[in-house]
C-alpha cells in the first residue's frame, strides 16, 4: 500500500516535471520568431544580423534532417565519408541561404494563430506575416517535429501552401539529374554557393 | 473551326467526367503531384526560361520597380480592378466545376465592384462581407474533371505552365473570356484591343511588383532557379486545383523514418 502510494506520487511528480520542461510548438514558433524579429530590428550591420540569425537557425531547425530529406533517394547511395561531407556542406549552404533570406526583412511582424497536431511527431503551427506597404499578408505554416517535446525542431516552412523543403528537394534532384546523378556535382554547387 | 474546337473540348470534358465519375480529391491530388509531372523538353524549357529572364530584366523588373514607388492606394486600386476583370474567367469556371454558390458570390462581387466600386478600383464586395476572391481558370476546370496536366512547359513571356493549362489559356481566346470577346474579338464601340492588351501587361507588372522581393530572394538563394520556379509553380497549381487552403502532404514521413533510424 505504502509502495503503491509512493509510485503514484512519483508518477505525478514526474509528469509535472516533464510537462514543466516540454515546450508547446506554437510557443516555440512564437519565441523563435520573436528572437529573429529582435535581431532584425536591431541597429546592426547586415553581416552581424546574419551571424545572429545563423545561431537561431542552428538551435531551432533540424538542419541535418532537412539536408538528408532534401537529398531524396540519392542519400541511399552515399558512403559514410560522403554523408559526412554532405552534412557539412549542406549546413553551410543552409545557414547562408536561410539567414540571408531573412536578413532582407526589417522588423517583420509574425502572428502565431493556430496549431494542428498531425501525430505525436508532428504539429503544424499556422502563422501570418503581416501586410506592409510593399507586400501583401503572407501565410506561413511551420512543420514542427515534436518527438522530443523538450526540444522541438523546425522541419519545414510552408509559405502560402508552398513547401520550402519540397522545393529544395526538387532543386537538388534537378542538379543531380542534369549531372547524371553525380553527387560530386551537387557538392561542388553547394561549395560554390557558400563561397560566394 | 471555332465551333469544332469548342465541341471537341466539351466532348472531352463530358467523356472525362463520366470516366472519372468516382474521382475524389485523392486522385486529382495524385495526378497533379509535382513529382509526377514530367519535364518532357527540359532543354527547350530552360532556353525559354532564360529568354524570359532576359525579358524580365529588360522590361518587367524595371517597370515593376517604378510601379512599386506609386502610392499604395493607387497600386491596390489597380490590383483590385485587374482582379475584378478576371471574374469574367472565374465565374464560368466556377460553374464548370459545379461550384454554383461561388459563381453566385463572384457574380455579386463583379456587379458591386464594377458599379459601386467604380470599375473594380474599390473592393466594395469584400467590405460588405462577400467571400474572399479566388481566381479560377479553364486549366483548373479541366483538372477538376480528371484531365491530367501533361508535360511541364515554359511559355515565352507567359512563363511556367503545363500542356493542360496552356490549352486552358487557349480557351480564353476562343470564346472563354468575355473580356477578350468584347475588346479584341468583337468590334464594340466602347472597348478596343488596346484595353485588353494593356490590362494583361498591367496584370503582369502588378504580379511582378507584388512578388518583387520574393522573386529576387529566390533567384539569389537558389542553386537552380529554373528547378525552384518549376517546383513552386506546380505546388501552387496543385493547391489551386484542389481549392484548398489545407496543407497538402508536404513531406513523405517514410523518408524521415529512414533518416531517423540511421
Residue map of PLM features:
Chain A
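Short beta-strand edge/turn micro-motifs at domain boundaries
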Residues: 137-166
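Positively charged n-region of N-terminal signal peptides that target proteins for export
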Residues: 1-5
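Low-complexity, intrinsically disordered terminal/linker segments enriched in charged
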Residues: 156-196
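Surface-exposed, charged secondary-structure patches
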Residues: 96-138, 189, 193-196
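Boundary at the C-terminal end of the N-terminal hydrophobic targeting segment
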Residues: 20-22
Amino acid at each position: 500500500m505504502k509502495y503503491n502510494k509512493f509510485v503514484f506520487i512519483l508518477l505525478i511528480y514526474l509528469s509535472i516535471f516533464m510537462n514543466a520542461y516540454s515546450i508547446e510548438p506554437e510557443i516555440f514558433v512564437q519565441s523563435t520568431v520573436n528572437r529573429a524579429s529582435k535581431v532584425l530590428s536591431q541597429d546592426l550591420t547586415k553581416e552581424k544580423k546574419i551571424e545572429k540569425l545563423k545561431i537561431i537557425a542552428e538551435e531551432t531547425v533540424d538542419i541535418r534532417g532537412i539536408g538528408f530529406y532534401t537529398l531524396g533517394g540519392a542519400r541511399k547511395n552515399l558512403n559514410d565519408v560522403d554523408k559526412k561531407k554532405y552534412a557539412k556542406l549542406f549546413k553551410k549552404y543552409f545557414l547562408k541561404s536561410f539567414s540571408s533570406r531573412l536578413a532582407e526583412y526589417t522588423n517583420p511582424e509574425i502572428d502565431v494563430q493556430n496549431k494542428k497536431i498531425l501525430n505525436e511527431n508532428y504539429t503544424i503551427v499556422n502563422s501570418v506575416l503581416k501586410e506592409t506597404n510593399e507586400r501583401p499578408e503572407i501565410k506561413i505554416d511551420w512543420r514542427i517535429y515534436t518527438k522530443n517535446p523538450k526540444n522541438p525542431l523546425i522541419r519545414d516552412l510552408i509559405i502560402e501552401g508552398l513547401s520550402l523543403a519540397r522545393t529544395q528537394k526538387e532543386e537538388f534532384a534537378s542538379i543531380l539529374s542534369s549531372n547524371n546523378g553525380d553527387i560530386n556535382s551537387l557538392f561542388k554547387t553547394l561549395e560554390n554557393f557558400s563561397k560566394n | 473551326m471555332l465551333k469544332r474546337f469548342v465541341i471537341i473540348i466539351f466532348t472531352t470534358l463530358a467523356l472525362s467526367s463520366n470516366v472519372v465519375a468516382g474521382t475524389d480529391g485523392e486522385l486529382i491530388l495524385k495526378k497533379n503531384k509535382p513529382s509526377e509531372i514530367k519535364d518532357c523538353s527540359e532543354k527547350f524549357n530552360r532556353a525559354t526560361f532564360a529568354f524570359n529572364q532576359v525579358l524580365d530584366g529588360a522590361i518587367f523588373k524595371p517597370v515593376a520597380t517604378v510601379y512599386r514607388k506609386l502610392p499604395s492606394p493607387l497600386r491596390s486600386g489597380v490590383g483590385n480592378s485587374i482582379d475584378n476583370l478576371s471574374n469574367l474567367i472565374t465565374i464560368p469556371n466556377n460553374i464548370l466545376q459545379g461550384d454554383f454558390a461561388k459563381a453566385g458570390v463572384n457574380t455579386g462581387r463583379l456587379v458591386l465592384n464594377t458599379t459601386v466600386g467604380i470599375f473594380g478600383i474599390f473592393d466594395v464586395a469584400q467590405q460588405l462581407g462577400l467571400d474572399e476572391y479566388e481566381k479560377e481558370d479553364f486549366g483548373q476546370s479541366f483538372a477538376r474533371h480528371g484531365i491530367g496536366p501533361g508535360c511541364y512547359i515554359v511559355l515565352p513571356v507567359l512563363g511556367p505552365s503545363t500542356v493542360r493549362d496552356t490549352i486552358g489559356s487557349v480557351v480564353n481566346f476562343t470564346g472563354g473570356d468575355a473580356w477578350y470577346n468584347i475588346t479584341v474579338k468583337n468590334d464594340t464601340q466602347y472597348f478596343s484591343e488596346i484595353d485588353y492588351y494593356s490590362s494583361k501587361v498591367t496584370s503582369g507588372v502588378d504580379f511582378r511588383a507584388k512578388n518583387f522581393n520574393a522573386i529576387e530572394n529566390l533567384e539569389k538563394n537558389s542553386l537552380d532557379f529554373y528547378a525552384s520556379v518549376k517546383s513552386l509553380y506546380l505546388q501552387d497549381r496543385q493547391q489551386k486545383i484542389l481549392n484548398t487552403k489545407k496543407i497538402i502532404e508536404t513531406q513523405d514521413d517514410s523518408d524521415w523514418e529512414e533518416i531517423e533510424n540511421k
